[in-house]
A protein has these predicted regions:
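Solvent-exposed, glycine/polar-rich loop segments of beta-barrel outer-membrane systems
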Residues: 134-152, 196-203
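Short sequence motifs at beta-strands and strand-loop junctions characteristic
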Residues: 46-51, 92-97, 154-163, 205-207
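Bacterial Sec-dependent N-terminal signal peptides
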Residues: 1-26, 215-219
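Short helix-to-loop capping/linker segments positioned immediately adjacent to catalytic or ligand/cofactor-binding
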Residues: 104-110, 153-157, 169
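Gram-negative (and chloroplast) outer-membrane scaffold detector with strong preference
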Residues: 21, 29-35, 59-141, 174-176, ...
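Predominantly the C-terminal beta-signal and adjacent terminal strand-loop region
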Residues: 156, 161, 166, 172-219
Length: 219
């Protein structure tokens, strides 16, 4: 029993000595794909679009290979939809989300250059939406352009989101207290952006890949 207690104390001392906090900022670009069931809309075309992601991050390292990381970021989830038959119909949508991913961070490698893998879940809130493009007016028989804010409709739009998140990257220790990171991260939404208020079910999901750089201060 005495040996077990001593072993536990030794383990806790090692863990505590290796534990450290870090905070930082991140920024980069993301490519979003909007997945939907087109049903009867056979000429409806949906394409992904690039956006921007910016955020702050905090991480607590339990050991030199395991940490708990939480980010707060602003991420755009943009997409474009058009019609194959009616080439004048072209909508470019820009969607801003506030996201909170919480992840386990696994690290491996040498002292200065290390690889890492982040796995976890995220919650998000749809802040606003904007659309720009052109459409066809059947009454006037002409094309018109628009550039406007999209108003949310509570019965239709699901503004809360959550899903799975994972990422891989490299970290370079610049000095004892500063480190730079490069990461490719993937967000997989599990909640449809539309509420099922109509007879025909209409499920729509975001899948977002972010390429981001970051700088961390290590305490």
């Amino acid at each position: 029993m005495k040996k077990i207690v001593m072993a536990l104390v030794a383990f806790l001392m090692v863990t505590t000595s290796q534990a450290q906090w870090r905070v930082g900022i991140t920024g980069g670009a993301d490519y979003n794909v909007f997945n939907m069931d087109q049903q009867y809309m056979t000429d409806y075309k949906v394409d992904g679009r690039w956006g921007v992601t910016l955020g702050i991050t905090g991480q607590y390292n339990v050991t030199d290979w395991l940490g708990v990381r939480a980010d707060l970021n602003w991420t755009q989830k943009n997409y474009r939809h058009s019609r194959v038959v009616y080439s004048d119909v072209d909508y470019k949508l820009t969607n801003d989300y506030l996201q909170l991913p919480v992840m386990a961070s696994f690290s491996f490698g040498g002292e200065r250059l290390r690889g890492f893998c982040n796995l976890g879940v995220y919650g998000a809130y749809w802040l606003n939406s904007h659309r720009k493009g052109s459409d066809w007016n059947t009454f006037s028989d002409r094309t018109f352009s628009f550039d406007e804010k999209v108003e949310f409709y509570d019965k239709r739009d699901q503004r809360w989101d959550c899903g799975l998140v994972g990422g891989i990257g490299l970290e370079y220790l610049i000095t004892r207290h500063w480190a730079a990171q490069a990461e490719v991260r993937y967000y997989y939404s599990t909640i449809s952006t539309t509420k099922q208020y109509m007879r025909n079910k209409d499920y729509r999901y975001h899948s977002t890949t972010a390429i981001q750089l970051g700088i961390n201060y290590i305490f």
